[in-house]
């Protein structure tokens, strides 16, 4: 399969730079996986699409202010993007500089360069940085960090992004990108879903900066997926198995929830799904056998991204590309701050041949 099979034309004007004033007021494109039928609606229509007893699985990661500016003590300007927090003092990060710092280099971080840190080691493209400060990494990031808006949101981060670029149920700090499908859920909608009898469970996947890395190979089977830490606790496993047992659906909110659940299913030894606390490099593209997820809430993804490949594996390649074509024609808003889709699983997707 070629990466170019997942390309589509997207006018610049359809990339959303700000979210809707009200989280749940965005548009919703419904894609029926088995037939490919499309229905246009608004996000709150989700309420009518879910049945009592269906299980919504959310990702409760919280975005950290992961972008830092500063300079090397020796002079040159640097930009640091945290990939993950290693412990209370150390981070693993991407560093952009005219000349990469060497191990032992002193860094002066923050807009006022008040935070002292040392680059201690290099691991491939990533740098290990230790803060020389009594405060924890999280406290330092909260005081001097900028929200890591995706590269296609072409504006500086604003104070408002600290809340707008978080889900209302975010709980565990560690992501450098929001699980954006969840941005559309506000408290009134969650309350109505609960009142209807829709069940809810929470996994954690700390989204890494790798989520924005372009696929740099021609053939997708050659792509090496970035690694992210995921947690699928016992209560989620129990909720999934119970939903399946009573004939209800498991609905993943976002591709990160999909990847968490399907990673836990892949690693399971005895049951359909078992608890999972580990790094995952799961790469889902057409031909993948889904085991857990029956329906998916997701935003519109970048052309040639691993995420549009994941959706194609779920709904079927042709159905997915047709839906994206319709979304462009109907001027849906794309990417992190954009509109959403609700997609049901297409069991025939696995048999589809792409690009032949």
From Swiss-Prot:
Main location: cytoplasm
GO molecular function, a single term: S-adenosylmethionine:tRNA ribosyltransferase-isomerase activity
Annotated GO CC locations: cytoplasm
Source taxon at top rank: Bacteria
EC number in record: 2.4.99.17
Places the protein is found: Cytoplasm
Catalytic activity: 7-aminomethyl-7-carbaguanosine(34) in tRNA + S-adenosyl-L-methionine = epoxyqueuosine(34) in tRNA + adenine + L-methionine + 2 H(+)
GO biological process, one term: queuosine biosynthetic process
Pathway the protein takes part in: tRNA modification; tRNA-queuosine biosynthesis
UniProt keyword S-adenosyl-L-methionine present: yes
Keyword check for Metal-binding: no
Alphabetical UniProt keywords: Cytoplasm, Queuosine biosynthesis, S-adenosyl-L-methionine, Transferase
Subunit structure: Monomer.
PANTHER family given in the database record: S-ADENOSYLMETHIONINE:TRNA RIBOSYLTRANSFERASE-ISOMERASE
HAMAP family: QueA
Its biological purpose: Transfers and isomerizes the ribose moiety from AdoMet to the 7-aminomethyl group of 7-deazaguanine (preQ1-tRNA) to give epoxyqueuosine (oQ-tRNA).
Family label: Belongs to the QueA family.
Name of the protein described by the UniProt record: S-adenosylmethionine:tRNA ribosyltransferase-isomerase
Upper classification of the organism: Bacteria, Pseudomonadati, Pseudomonadota, Gammaproteobacteria, Enterobacterales
């Amino acid at each position: 399969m070629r990466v170019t099979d997942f390309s589509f034309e997207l006018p610049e004007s359809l990339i959303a730079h700000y979210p809707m004033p009200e989280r749940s007021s965005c548009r919703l494109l419904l894609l029926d996986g088995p037939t490919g039928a499309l229905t246009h609606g608004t996000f709150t229509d989700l309420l009518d699409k879910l049945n009592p007893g269906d299980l919504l699985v959310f990702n409760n990661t919280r975005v950290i202010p992961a972008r830092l500016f500063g300079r090397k003590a020796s002079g040159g300007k640097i930009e640091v993007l945290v990939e993950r927090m290693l412990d209370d003092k150390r981070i693993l990060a991407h560093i952009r500089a005219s000349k990469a710092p060497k191990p032992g280099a002193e860094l002066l971080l923050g807009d006022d360069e008040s935070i002292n840190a040392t680059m201690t080691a290099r691991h491939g493209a990533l740098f290990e940085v230790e803060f020389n400060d009594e405060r924890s990494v999280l406290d330092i990031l909260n005081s001097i960090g900028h929200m890591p808006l995706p590269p296609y949101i072409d504006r500086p981060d604003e104070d408002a992004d600290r809340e707008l670029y978080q889900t209302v149920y975010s709980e565990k700090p560690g992501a450098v990108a929001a699980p954006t499908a969840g941005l559309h859920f506000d408290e009134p909608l969650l309350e109505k879903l609960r009142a209807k009898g829709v069940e809810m469970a929470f996994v954690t996947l700390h989204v890494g900066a790798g989520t924005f890395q372009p696929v740099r190979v021609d053939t997708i089977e050659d792509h090496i997926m970035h690694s992210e830490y995921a947690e699928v606790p016992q209560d989620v496993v129990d909720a999934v198995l119970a939903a399946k047992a009573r004939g209800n659906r498991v609905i993943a909110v976002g591709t990160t929830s999909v990847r968490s659940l399907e990673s836990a299913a892949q690693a399971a030894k005895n049951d359909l799904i078992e608890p999972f606390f580990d790094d995952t490099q799961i790469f889902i593209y057409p031909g993948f056998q889904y085991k857990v997820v029956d329906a998916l809430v997701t935003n519109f993804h970048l052309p040639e991204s691993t995420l549009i490949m994941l959706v194609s594996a779920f709904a079927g390649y042709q159905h997915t590309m047709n839906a994206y074509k319709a979304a462009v024609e109907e001027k849906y808003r794309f990417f992190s701050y954009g509109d959403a889709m609700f997609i049901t699983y297409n069991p025939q997707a696995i048999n589809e041949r792409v690009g032949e």
